[in-house]
Swiss-Prot record:
GO terms for biological process: cell morphogenesis; division septum assembly; regulation of cell division; regulation of cell septum assembly. Gene3D superfamilies: 2.160.20.70, 3.30.70.260. Keywords: Cell cycle, Cell division, Septation. PANTHER family: SEPTUM SITE-DETERMINING PROTEIN MINC (PTHR34108:SF1). It comes from Pseudomonas fluorescens (strain Pf0-1). Residues 112-140 are annotated as: Disordered. This is Probable septum site-determining protein MinC. Interacts with MinD and FtsZ.
C-alpha cells in the first residue's frame, strides 16, 4: 500500500508584495453633508470608476481646529457612492482611536503628496521652502499625577511630568516628553512635525506613543522587550526606536 504525503503539508498560500491602484480620499474639512454632495457630483462624471473602488481615507491633513470625525458616518457616505474603505491614514489621536474601535487598519501619515485625480497637466515642482525657526518656550513641568481624561499640552517646548500618568490621560508637546513615573496613558511628542523630538519615561506601559505623527499603540508596545522598563523613544526615518535608559 503506497504512502502519500498528507495534504496539510503542502503550502496553501503565498505572501506576495503587490503595487495596487488605490484611491486616496484626502479630507480637508470635517463636513459630511458637503462631502456627500460633492462626491455625488464627482461620481456622476465617471460612475464606472467609482463602482466598488477600494479607498484609503486620509484624515492626516485635517486642520487641528476641526472636531472629531464621525468615522462610521464618513465610511457610510463613501459606501453610498461606491467607495469601499480599506484603511484610514491619520495622525490625530481621536481619529486613530475611532478606527481602532471599529477594527479599521490605520496607516501612518504620508510625507508625500498624492496627485489629484483630475490633474492632467504636469505641475512644475516647487522649490522647498525653508521651515521657520522654532520659537523656544520654557519647559512645562507637571508635579502632580495626570489623571485619566486629562490632556496636557506643552506648546513650543518640552513637557516634564514628575509623577505618574494614568490610562486615558494624554500628554502632547511640540518638543520632548519626559515622564518620571509610570507612563500608562498616551504620549505624543513633536506634534507639529519635529522629527528630532524624543520621549523619555521610567516605566513604559503606554496606550500610545507618537513622534511627529509616527506612532505605536499598546498592542505593538506590549510585544517590545522594553515594555515596563525605563526607555528612550526616538524617530529614525519612519521607524520609532525604543531603547533602554
Amino acid at each position: 500500500m503506497s504512502q502519500t504525503e498528507p495534504k496539510d503539508q503542502d503550502p496553501v498560500f503565498q505572501l506576495k508584495g503587490s503595487m495596487l491602484a488605490i484611491t486616496v480620499l484626502e479630507l480637508s474639512r470635517n463636513d459630511l453633508d458637503s462631502l456627500d454632495r460633492q462626491l455625488a457630483a464627482k461620481v456622476a462624471q465617471a460612475p464606472n470608476f467609482f463602482s466598488n473602488a477600494p479607498l484609503v481615507l486620509a484624515l492626516d491633513k485635517l486642520p487641528p481646529s476641526e472636531g472629531a470625525v464621525d468615522l462610521p458616518g464618513l465610511m457610510r457616505v463613501c459606501r453610498q457612492h461606491g467607495l469601499r474603505t480599506l484603511a484610514i491614514r491619520a495622525s490625530r489621536i481621536e481619529d486613530i482611536a475611532a478606527a481602532i474601535a471599529i477594527d479599521i487598519p490605520v496607516l501612518p501619515p504620508s510625507g508625500a503628496r498624492e496627485r489629484p485625480l483630475e490633474s492632467a497637466e504636469p505641475v512644475a515642482p516647487k522649490k522647498p521652502e525653508k521651515p521657520p525657526e522654532p520659537t523656544v518656550k520654557p519647559t512645562r513641568v507637571i508635579t502632580t499625577p495626570v489623571r485619566g481624561g486629562q490632556q496636557i499640552y506643552a506648546q513650543g517646548g518640552d513637557l516634564v511630568v514628575v509623577s505618574s500618568v494614568s490610562p486615558g490621560a494624554e500628554l502632547l508637546a511640540d518638543g520632548n516628553i519626559h515622564v518620571y513615573g509610570p507612563m500608562r496613558g498616551r504620549a505624543l511628542a513633536g506634534v507639529k512635525g519635529d522629527t528630532k523630538a524624543r520621549i523619555f519615561c521610567q516605566q513604559l506601559s503606554a496606550e500610545l506613543i507618537s513622534i511627529a505623527g509616527h506612532y505605536k499603540v499598546s498592542e505593538d508596545l506590549r510585544r517590545d522587550p522594553m515594555w515596563g522598563s525605563g526607555v528612550q523613544v526616538s524617530l529614525s526615518g519612519d521607524v520609532l526606536n525604543i531603547i533602554r535608559l
